[in-house]
Curated annotation (Swiss-Prot):
Highest taxon above the source species: Eukaryota
Residues annotated for ATP binding in this entry: 211-218
Family indicated by similarity: Belongs to the AAA ATPase family.
Keywords: ATP-binding, Cytoplasm, Nucleotide-binding, Nucleus, Proteasome
Protein's recorded name: 26S proteasome regulatory subunit 7
PANTHER family, alphabetized: 26S PROTEASOME REGULATORY SUBUNIT
């Protein structure tokens, strides 16, 4: 039987436990380690160092701010949304209180809502806002943020010819005298206004071009638009005849309002007899709307508002039907007649149209012009086209003089019963 005292003596004689040093710990960790463990551990430490270095360069610190990793950032969208302006509401400035003072107030009218007295936005100068213009206001304080252009009907905006026509004065034949008259009225005031200022006279404002169909009235208007850098607006007379009462007059007002916003503008009314006919009472009131449109046009031509650098060209085949109030000086200062071309003019027109054709060299254009008496430029163009058709039928690549003679026999003589030139000459 073991004695209790002997057990206690043995426990006292045992040595105290010795703690493991780093070498022992490293030795214990080396048990069961493969041959590449040390290299893997070195690579992992290098990866940690590189990751910490990248984070320092990016300026990123691990925090609880909720910022996602850079791979999920979309800086372009964030920048766009930060600079995106809220939509504005369209209003009209009706009156300015304390004009020229720093604390000026503006009375605006928001359609179908109410009237407000507001101030200017931070990005707008007081000189940019005038009475009567449209403005854009924010939806919170209704402060004026931007000035807006005047409201113009889309159909009027579509009338403007953006590109210059490719017709020059060299492409117009038989109208030498008429071109000179047009250049005096349209080109000279726009290109050399100082000549009129020195003499103390106002330049002519409008021109009426009249004559039979096909004599080059519209062609000369296109050549004028090419020559000047002014905006060219072509209006067909029938476009201003609208169904509802007041629509045609409103389109005329919008047309001249758009023209005044340009530096210089040429308005060409083609077939003006559609709206400019003499006033009469037929008893049924069918032409009342057309007459209202013409009265608005007369008011715009010579009303209270100065027209500035707006030149008006009008073309018609029937000058005898126009209203006398439309033709008086001050509205249409010059009347230019486009008659039938003479022999030299017809030969020149033949040369112009044959320039772009593959023709033989021995064609006598003066002889062809003698065979086309009382012909317009449109008739001569039809002759050239028909001569090309004769060459195509004969499977030739060059148009000969015989083709022109056959075309003259077909167009000028056979189609004479369809020609209305003599009738229009009676009207003109």
């Amino acid at each position: 039987m073991v004695n209790k005292e002997d057990v206690e003596d043995e426990l006292l004689n045992e040595t105290a436990p010795v703690a493991l040093d780093e070498g022992d710990i490293a030795l214990l960790k080396s048990y069961g380690v493969g041959p590449y463990s040390k290299s893997i551990r070195i690579l992992e430490e290098d990866i940690k160092k590189m990751t910490s270095k990248v984070n320092e360069l990016c300026g990123i610190k691990e925090s609880d701010t909720g910022i996602g990793p850079p791979s999920q950032w979309d800086l372009v969208v964030d920048k766009t949304s930060a600079h995106e302006e809220p939509p504005l509401q369209v209003a009209r400035c009706t009156k300015i209180i304390d004009v020229g003072k720093p604390n000026a107030k503006y009375i605006i009218t928001v359609k179908q809502i109410a009237k407000f007295v507001v101030a200017l936005g931070d990005k707008l100068s007081p000189t940019d806002v005038e009475e009567g213009i449209r403005v854009g206001v924010d939806r919170n304080k209704y402060q004026i943020q931007i000035p807006l252009p005047p409201k113009i009907d889309a159909s009027v905006t579509m009338m403007q010819v953006e590109e210059k026509p490719d017709i020059t004065y060299k492409d117009v034949g038989g109208c030498k005298e008429q071109i000179e008259k047009l250049r005096e009225v349209v080109e000279m005031p726009l290109l050399h206004p100082e000549k009129f200022v020195n003499l103390g006279i106002d330049p002519p404002k409008g021109v009426l071009m009249y004559g039979p169909p096909g004599t080059g009235k519209t062609l000369c208007a296109r050549a004028v638009a090419n020559r000047t850098d002014a905006a060219f607006v072509r209006v067909i007379g029938s476009e201003l005849v609208q169904k509802y009462v007041g629509e045609g007059a409103r389109m005329v007002r919008d047309l001249f309002q758009m023209a005044r916003s340009k530096k210089a503008c040429i308005i060409f009314f083609d077939e003006v007899d559609a709206i400019g006919g003499a006033r009469f009472d037929d008893g049924a009131g069918g032409d009342n709307e057309v007459q209202r449109t013409m009265l608005e046009l007369i008011n715009q031509l010579d009303g209270f508002d100065p027209r500035g650098n707006i030149k008006v060209l009008m073309a018609t085949n029937r000058p005898d039907t126009l209203d006398p109030a439309l033709l008086r000086p001050g509205r249409l200062d010059r009347k230019v007649e486009f008659g039938l071309p003479d022999l030299e003019g017809r030969a020149h027109i033949f040369t112009i149209h044959a320039k772009t054709m593959s023709c033989a060299r021995d064609i006598r254009f003066e002889l062809l012009a003698r065979l086309c008496p009382n012909s317009t430029g449109a008739d001569i163009r039809s002759v050239c086209t028909e001569a090309g058709m004769f060459a195509i039928r004969a499977r030739r690549k060059v148009v000969s003089e015989k083709d022109f003679l056959e075309a003259i026999d077909k167009v000028i003589k056979s189609y004479a019963k369809f020609s209305a030139t003599s009738r229009y000459m009676h009207y003109n």
